[in-house]
């Protein structure tokens, strides 16, 4: 069960586009507890991706405040914050090189040097994902969209963040691979269920039911249910 203290809290978040005189996010308030699994659902254009990017502090806010462990997120805490709150894009960016080089890449940065690359863990996850070990030697340039998503997911999970923000991580995958991703993420969560938190955007209602302790429903830039 999640702790009572929010690990992330959004208070009245808003995103405004002057050119269109439109609020893309409006009055979004949300508490995310440590150890919680949240799935965000809603129609296309409802603000699901923008919500995740805002929770990751990747886009500027025009209203409201984001809090991490009770402290307002500002530019002064961003490197530490982003090492603990990791966002997985629908179209992840990979460096030129092999899958293995992409997985090892984050560990050169000081915010991740307290962690280590765990080859045995990666091999286990590859088996769950029904991928052969030689997948690690594949060039990032030769990866399909689904394989790139898998690579980025493995890279994110091995960093053991406090919060993993997943933007439709199975959208480009076949059903068997999607099932493997669900199993991987569930295993990752269960390794430390009191400390790890997942916020997952999905268009699949059955997937949402499987993966969520709580569902948020978005419409027209607002959370209309579940907050």
Place the predicted regions along the sequence by residue:
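Conserved ABC transporter NBD signature motif
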Residues: 64-73, 81
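Conserved ABC ATPase "signature" region
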Residues: 116-135
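ABC ATPase C-loop
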Residues: 156-157
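Conserved ABC ATPase signature
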Residues: 139-143, 147
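A short, flexible loop at the N-terminus of ABC-type nucleotide-binding domains that lies
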Residues: 2-10, 14-27
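Conserved catalytic motifs of ABC-family nucleotide-binding domains
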Residues: 91-101, 111-113
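Helix-to-loop junction immediately C-terminal to a conserved catalytic motif
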Residues: 56
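Catalytic Walker B motif of ABC-type/P-loop ATPase nucleotide-binding domains
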Residues: 164-168
